[in-house]
């Protein structure tokens, strides 16, 4: 290891925002990519003390509703090795993915000075990989780029309208990067299938790496408790969103709870966490109708801190994560597993892949896909699996499944398990450059 610390520039893809008095504000503590970045950075700094420092690109704290100082996102022990690059990005998961102010960086010499000692970049904004590459080239800086790929938009699994899709930019990032990093193997496979639609050859691709990152186990472990809610609690932690044919399938959860209410006599509480705090009256009416008024939706104005969330999931019994077209399955399912929830999920993609790797293809709470709507789980089967999970509460089976989810979640989705793989990728890119300079 060289004497000076390796400096990592980490550009975070921020997409979670809400409205306050009609004006948009970022929700960093509930943002998936922000929490992934916090977890990766914290884990690396803890495991490799005095070897790394980070320059983290985020919007300003005053442009959020849940952060007073960006430093507060990290534990005090890490503050000395973290600095921030403030970026005034549009409040939108779409327009922010295309925003890049090249002139800003070129006109102010302070930016060049900031980047001169950067050794490597981790880029969550994979639609902007080529932009960063061009900027570094203009500055005559040899900064290798690891582009992460957490949210694929492609003809296989479209997320936004075709004319503004991220697809071509994301495919370009596989070429413009030095390493293309994927959250899970299922995501890598889907990305390569999408790439083959656009390009004839894979020879120009950057090397690929599967990190296996989903959640920060140390953070979740702090809130572990054996004391569960008195009433068995089932929750849906993903967005209430109509994007991409309701790709989070919040409506399926509501429908399943409505069915559940007719087939069980056991008490239960069903909650939708509404993390973006943007549920519309129309969405709430749909949820009420489908669920037969059996689902509580956290209100847009209800305060729910990161600590509140971690306390809630650790005291809950059953988590439903119902992604079909988003292959990783969402950060919330990883957090649910590590919190020892019984996880109800479709038998597809990363949900299935990690269970297969762990030797549990027969996981009892996998759900079927709707035969008429292949992008959605079957609501009746979801209801049946929730009922079976409810029936298991207080039995040996509940304990066994909770421990199984916990152990598989840690092994296949924790930053702690992924840390050495990530650091190895950084070393692979940085050491040859440092050796050449020396």
Set out the residue ranges of the language-model regions.
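A short, active-site helix/loop in glycosyltransferases that binds the activated sugar's phosphate group
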Residues: 164, 168-205
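Conserved donor-binding/catalytic core segment of Leloir-type glycosyltransferases
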Residues: 6-12, 181, 225-248, 254-258, ...
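N-terminal subdomain of nucleotide-sugar transferases
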Residues: 1-68, 116, 262
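Acidic donor-binding loop of glycosyltransferase active sites
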Residues: 117-120, 311-328
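A charged, aromatic-enriched C-terminal amphipathic alpha-helix characteristic of glycosyltransferases
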Residues: 373-377, 394-431
């Amino acid at each position: 290891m060289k004497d000076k610390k390796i400096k990592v520039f980490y550009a975070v893809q921020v997409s979670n925002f809400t409205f306050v008095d009609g004006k948009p504000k970022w929700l960093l503590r509930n943002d998936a990519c922000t929490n992934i970045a916090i977890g990766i950075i914290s884990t690396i700094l803890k495991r490799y003390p005095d070897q790394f420092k980070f320059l983290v690109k985020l919007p300003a704290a005053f442009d959020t509703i849940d952060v007073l100082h960006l430093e507060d996102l990290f534990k005090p022990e890490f503050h000395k090795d973290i600095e921030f690059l403030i970026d005034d990005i549009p409040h939108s998961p779409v327009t922010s993915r295309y925003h890049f102010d090249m002139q800003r960086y070129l006109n102010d010499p302070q930016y060049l000075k900031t980047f001169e000692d950067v050794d490597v970049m981790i880029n969550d904004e994979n639609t902007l990989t080529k932009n960063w590459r061009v900027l570094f080239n203009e500055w005559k800086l040899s900064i290798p780029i690891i582009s992460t790929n957490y949210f694929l938009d492609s003809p296989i699994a479209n997320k936004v309208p075709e004319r503004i899709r991220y697809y071509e930019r994301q495919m370009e990032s596989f070429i413009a990067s030095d390493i293309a990093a994927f959250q899970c193997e299922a995501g890598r496979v889907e990305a390569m299938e999408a790439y083959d639609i656009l390009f004839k050859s894979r020879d120009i691709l950057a090397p690929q790496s599967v990190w296996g990152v989903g959640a920060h186990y140390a953070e979740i472990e702090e809130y572990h408790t054996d004391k569960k809610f008195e009433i068995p609690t089932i929750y849906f932690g993903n967005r209430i969103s109509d994007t991409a044919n309701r790709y989070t399938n919040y409506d399926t959860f509501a429908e399943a709870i409505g069915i559940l209410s007719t087939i069980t006599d056991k008490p239960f509480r069903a909650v939708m966490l509404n993390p973006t705090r943007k549920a519309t009256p129309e969405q709430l009416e749909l949820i009420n109708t489908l669920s037969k008024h059996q689902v509580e939706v956290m209100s847009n104005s209800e305060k729910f801190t990161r600590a509140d969330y971690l306390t809630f999931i650790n005291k809950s019994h059953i988590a439903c994560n119902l992604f079909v077209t988003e292959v990783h399955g969402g950060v919330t399912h990883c957090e649910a597993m590590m919190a020892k929830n019984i996880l109800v999920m479709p038998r597809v993609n990363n949900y299935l892949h990690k269970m297969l790797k762990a030797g549990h293809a027969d996981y009892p709470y996998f759900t079927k896909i709707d035969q008429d709507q292949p992008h959605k789980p079957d609501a009746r089967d979801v209801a049946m699996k929730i009922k079976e999970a409810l029936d298991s509460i207080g039995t040996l089976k509940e304990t066994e499944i909770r421990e199984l989810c916990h152990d598989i979640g840690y092994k296949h989705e924790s930053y702690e398990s992924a840390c050495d793989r990530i650091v190895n990728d950084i070393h692979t890119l940085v050491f040859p450059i440092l050796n050449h300079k020396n």
